[in-house]
């Protein structure tokens, strides 16, 4: 599979910007429908994890992906993501996101910038790692100073 095809695969599997991830991952029926639709795009030994706070916990399979997200979404009433940029890094695809969410105890939506690295093996998703900061993800792919069409913004 070409590197451009890797980007197309990964981006094509991301939820639309108006999809509430809190609802998607919490609803058993929606989750089962989604996994049936996308299972063939993932390696049987697919793993994922949140890379944060000097620890990494790994989850196995699509049900592990759900468990990881349910853990993350615990305090959130709503949560959605928008892709800002997808960067071709060979067998890995770096996605830069804007995340939007509303905590259960609040009426205000908050916004954050995060990143994920998706690894493709033999034309299927092999691993997904989610990072709370873009800097951490850029370092993980060896691009601390920016890459492709993305250049790290400098603090004022």
Task: Indicate residue ranges for each PLM-predicted region.
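A short linear-motif detector with a strong N-terminal bias
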Residues: 19, 26-28, 60-61, 73-75, ...
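Short, low-complexity N-terminal intrinsically disordered segments enriched in polar/charged residues
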Residues: 1-44, 144-156
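A beta-strand edge to alpha-helix "cap/lid" segment located at domain peripheries
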Residues: 1-9, 67-156
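Positively charged, low-complexity intrinsically disordered regions
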Residues: 15, 53, 103-104
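A solvent-exposed, acidic/Ser-Thr-rich amphipathic alpha-helical stretch
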Residues: 33-91
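Generic anion/oxyanion-binding catalytic loop in active/binding sites
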Residues: 27, 54, 126
């Amino acid at each position: 599979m070409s590197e451009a095809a890797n980007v197309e695969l990964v981006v094509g599997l991301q939820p639309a910007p108006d999809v509430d991830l809190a609802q998607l991952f919490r609803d058993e029926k929606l989750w089962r429908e989604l996994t049936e639709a996308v299972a063939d795009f993932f390696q049987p030994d697919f793993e994922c994890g949140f890379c944060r706070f000097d620890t990494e916990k790994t989850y196995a399979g699509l049900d592990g992906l759900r468990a990881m997200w349910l853990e993350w979404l615990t305090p959130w009433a709503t949560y959605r993501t928008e892709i800002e940029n997808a960067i071709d890094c060979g067998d890995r695809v770096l996605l830069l996101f804007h995340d939007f969410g509303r905590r259960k105890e609040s009426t205000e939506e908050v916004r954050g910038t995060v990143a994920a690295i998706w690894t493709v093996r033999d034309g299927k998703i092999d691993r997904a790692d989610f990072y709370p900061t873009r800097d951490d993800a850029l370092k993980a792919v060896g691009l601390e100073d920016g890459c492709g069409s993305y250049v790290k913004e400098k603090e004022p």
